[in-house]
Each structure stands twice: as structure tokens, then as C-alpha cells.
């Protein structure tokens, strides 16, 4: 966790045009305070800041952002939006939530993975102990796909109509030559796409597959794809938590 936030904050400090952030929740703790202070400083420099969070994710976490936090952030130039605000009768949409975790900085650098904004990724939790999660930093053409994923949700919630071409990009830096697939699952639109991506990747594997998942509940089709890979001689490594924050 510490490495992710250190790299993220350093990249934010270098931002010149815009910073887009999307998380299931921003927990109101020491990490969020440091992040928002930094974002406010960048906004003061003229950098456009847009941040999106899931309303259910915010309300369900132990230290949610409250109206006074959002008002203060708006006054400091940090534009915040909620994904699918919880309204009565909430049962109709409570399960279609936004779990995307995306940061895009100037169209050059992107972050995605499993971490929200919270200091327990560094400090752990008393009831769980140390917390391990995965996050990746991306440069190169793949960042554009993270941008599209963010803008799709942002525009849906704000009706702003911001297009990728309206986002000021400098020339994208060249990639490393490694292949990266950005797969966006949208509830009610393409619910099967993530499973299909897993199966395609497993069926294409030649040497090794590494899976890290805190809630490993693969469907029958995914289990069969794992079995096929193993039967071909592919080494399959699966990491799951010894102790989970969710009982299932």
C-alpha cells in the first residue's frame, strides 16, 4: 500500500493539465487528507481535478466523506461527483455499483487495481491484521483506455459530455512493448465481459498464470478454463487471503 500511495502522490505533484480519479470510496482518514491537500494545491496551480466516488461505497465505509468535506473540496477547486446516489427506493439499484479504481494524470500516467483511498492499506486493521492488495501504474497507449473508462462513468453521472478529444493530452509516452488489456465491466451493459476476458487469457496461456483475488469465487466456466490450462502443463498460481474482511 505504501508504495502505491508514494508513487501516486509523486505523479500528482508533476501534473500540469488535469487529474481524474475514480474510487469505490475515499475513506476520510490520514491518506485521504494528504491526497485532498495535494489535489487542492494542484487546483490552485490551475490543474483541473475531477474525482468520482460510489455513493453506496461512501455510505457503507466506516469513515465516509460528509457534506462538509465535499463543500470544502469544491471551494478548494476539487470537483467531486457521486456515482448513482442512494435514493428511496434504493433496493432497485443498490447492487449495481461502481468498483472501478482509476487515476489518470495528463493522459500520460494511469493507475488501476484493488486499492481504494484508505490508510488501512498501509497500517492494516485490528480485526484483520496486515493488508495486502495489488495496484499497477501504467504508461503508454493503454492509459487512453483507462481514460475512456473514467469518462464514460463521469459523463453518465454529471451529464457533462466531456469527450476524450476535449481532454488536453500531450504526446503519449511510448509503452514498454508489453501487452496490457484494459477490460471494463459495466453492470446491465456487459456483465459477462470480465469472465470472458479471464477465460480468453487462461486459454491463451502457455507457461504460467498468476491469479491474486481476495474473493475467489470463480464460475464454472472459469474453473474449467483453469483446469484446461493446468492440463496443458501451464503452471497456475492462485493467491487468496488467509483471513478475509468479508465472510462468505
Question: What are these regions, as identified by a protein language model?
Answer:
Residues 1-248:
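Charged, low-complexity intrinsically disordered terminal segments
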